[in-house]
Amino acid sequence: MLGTIVKKIIGTKNDRELKRMAKLVDAINSHAEAMAQLTDGDLQHKTEAFRQAFKDGKTLDELLPEAFAVVREASTRVMGMRHFDVQMMGGISLHEGRISEMRTGEGKTLTATLPAYLNALSGEGVHVVTVNDYLAERDANWMRPLYEFLGLSVGIILSQQPTEHKRAAYAADITYGTNNEYGFDYLRDNMAFRLEDRVQRGLNYAIVDEVDSILIDEARTPLIISGPAADSSELYQAVNLLMPQLQKQEEEGEGDYFIDEKQRQVELTEAGHQKIEALLVNNQLLEQGESLYAAHNLALLHHVHAALKAHALFHIDRDYIVQDGQIVIVDEHTGRTMPGRRWSEGIHQAIEAKEGLNIQQENQTLASTTFQNYFRLYNKLSGMTGTADTEALEFRQIYGMDVVVVPTNKPMVRVDANDLVYLSLQEKFDAIVKEVTEAVAKGAPVLVGTATIEASEYLSKRLKQDKVHHEVLNAKFHQREAQIIAQAGRPGAVTIATNMAGRGTDIMLGGNPEEQIKHMETPSESEAEKIRAEWQANHDTVMKAGGLHIIGTERHESRRIDNQLRGRAGRQGDPGYTRFFLSMEDDLMRIFASDKIRNLMRSLGLENGEAIEHRWVTRAIENAQRKVEGRNFDIRKNLLEYDNVANDQRQVIYGQRDQILEAADLVNSVKGIRRDVITELVHDYMAPGSVEDQWDIPGLEKTLEAEFQCHAPVGQWLNEDNQLHIEGLIDKLVESMDEDYQRKEAEIGTEDLRKIEKHLMLQILDRHWKEHLANMDHLRQGIHLRGYAQKNPKQEYKKEAFELFQGLLNQIQHELIRVLHSLQVRRDDEVERLEQQREEEAREQAEKMKMQTVAEPGTDGSAQPQPSQQQGEQPKTMVRNGRKVGRNEPCPCGSGKKYKQCHGKIE
């Protein structure tokens, strides 16, 4: 009560925002007369003047009044459309990183030109985000004349577009595209091996159209680029057959490999290296005279290490069991089996080969993110929609964005009738058919909104039985959809549409004459005038019939979806009528309406076909919707905390990739990593603070020699110098390994070694990151079970994910130094062969790569079907297939270069 009184006295927060923006609109309007006096050339010159002013230190906020006035004047001249004052308010809130709630028909597309122009002046790019390719193309081409008149370039990104076209589109001042494509391009850029293979140039400012759909409904939909893991079944089996021929080294005796029980590691001895190379040559897995450590044989070396570990370290009925033809891991702490979990680094496949089982090829996640996490990367994010206020709390808490409800240009005269509630579905649909028939008889156009495809098909069947001509909309063909919606305002037109179908296109009363003219083959002026005259007559008929008639066949869990349907009617001050028809058998009523309402309806003695209609019932339903919205928000908020863990890790890895790609050379990085690896290794064998009797000097020497080809006499150094402490020993080892590496550099050549370092660092980082993503998936899927042990699954997930990530970073560093110090380049063309190998891998991955959005996980982190998925719809999956490209053929990216000189070249 007190809150209501205060609001009446000082106004709501939204009222205060509108008052503040009204002053800015007055400042914009004060420039109108001066702008109207300018020639076209002078008006166009303003853009360059603004850019210079920005470079000289003026802020975009300071430039806003005059810049908005320039856009409005240019739009009037070029487009024949002048921005209303309320559109100026919408533009101001978008520039300030807020969400503008603007009713359908209020001109959101034109409104977006104001902040898009202003923010493009910085030269850092503006991304306009739409829900499908059709709207991206339509809006970009519609507004292109205005932007180009003002000297700004416009780009469009579409799926299946060549890389060069995409790069050019992103380089434009203003870029239009879909949320999916922006997200996938971000992921692909973070898989690139060269800077020139990237397409995006930074995430500066985004204007998201239908922001509620993208940032709420699809917020947690994962964007995943996946591909089948390389099928190396035959190689695993072939290498497996060689392992029994290797002998374990006992103490200091002879042998081919030794086991470090403490570190749970196994390494080949010098004799073992020679023996395995001979065996590989005999089995035609390695060419005669080649080294297993040659750069292009690293994959084979990886298989040998995996097979050796499978035979020496992992034992049946201790580490794993064989169950139903599969390897099932046994938890070393609890002794319980862990179905569905797999060891990484090829060990699981090597054990499958060892036990004579089918080697499973998995679909591997190469990169992933969610819309929620992707859009939070922008320096500034804004959005517009007809329905956002009901989700204002979520926008503020998750994205830090306030919602500004922009008033309509003309007063709203739409009639929103109370809901009609029937006892059964049959009675409800009978009433809907009757309502449609009566509205058509009056000459009113009717739009019927359904929640599912099944309901729309059932209603279509009923209308056909009554011989009512109608159109059914689905979301498969955007071009067709827009045409149907454009003409859905003709007298007596009946259109059935599911939830989201047709968003982005206004329903004009009487139909859309310009759309009709556009689809005619070279219409004469007289034909065009005739169509416009027909439209005027149709428009008058529809206005007399009360405007567009909206019928909702059921309430959704979210009031926002209901408001989207209602918002179709009453555009720009037009008349309109909306009503929802419900039944006690609808999902929302069945689940959330109390038995009291059902019993009340029965006690009223309602006859067949009678409905209950009262504002109390409508209010009770809205209260039920609020509760559901609150519950869904809590679920999304809870899940975001899980997502944030993976997102933080992704930013670290992608940041490291950026540094590798952008670095001229990695000499200092490799030196730093080498010191970190040696420090960790020494501390493993000579724990800080321990006494000398606890040190394992022979183990350290053996590991240094086996893993890093470092023949350092650690024991001798310590005997010769009593003052040599652990840190001094680390310095001595690092110095020794630096000298070894310098000799290798002289042997290979500085330029070639720099290329190999960059290539290997990216390759190792990517491989371990892919394995880490799989490990995180496995952790996520089972984490909810911790709740049964009275543990907090969220805290357990964060703790274990951190441990996994620490292990990942250590593995990457360790393997990089091991491979670089073991590397042997014996032939002049070795680096070129390495490049060719990388080209082949990249091409095969691109051919098999899938871009997909998949079902979201459950509240506890486990996988579950996506609840918003409509019956009959499948998660969107885009697959790229193509024939293999020869090295001397043009690169399929569209660069015009030969394939070997483009994708895959290590620079």
UniProtKB/Swiss-Prot annotation:
Cofactor(s) listed in the protein's UniProt record: Zn(2+)
Enzyme Commission number: 7.4.2.8
Residue spans of biased composition, Basic and acidic residues class: 834-850
Residue positions binding Zn(2+): C891, C893, C902, H903
GO biological process: intracellular protein transmembrane transport; protein import; protein targeting; protein transport by the Sec complex
Compositional bias segments (type: Low complexity): 864-875
Region (Disordered), start-end ranges: 834-907
Cofactor mode of binding and number, as noted: May bind 1 zinc ion per subunit.
Family: Belongs to the SecA family.
Membrane topology: Peripheral membrane protein
Domain of life: Bacteria
Species whose genome carries this gene: Alcanivorax borkumensis (strain ATCC 700651 / DSM 11573 / NCIMB 13689 / SK2)
GO CC, any one term: plasma membrane
Main localization category: membrane
Signal sequence interval, chain numbering: none
Cell compartment(s), UniProt: Cell inner membrane; Cytoplasm
Entry protein name: Protein translocase subunit SecA
Top-rank EC class of the record's enzyme: translocase
Quaternary structure and partners: Monomer and homodimer. Part of the essential Sec protein translocation apparatus which comprises SecA, SecYEG and auxiliary proteins SecDF-YajC and YidC.
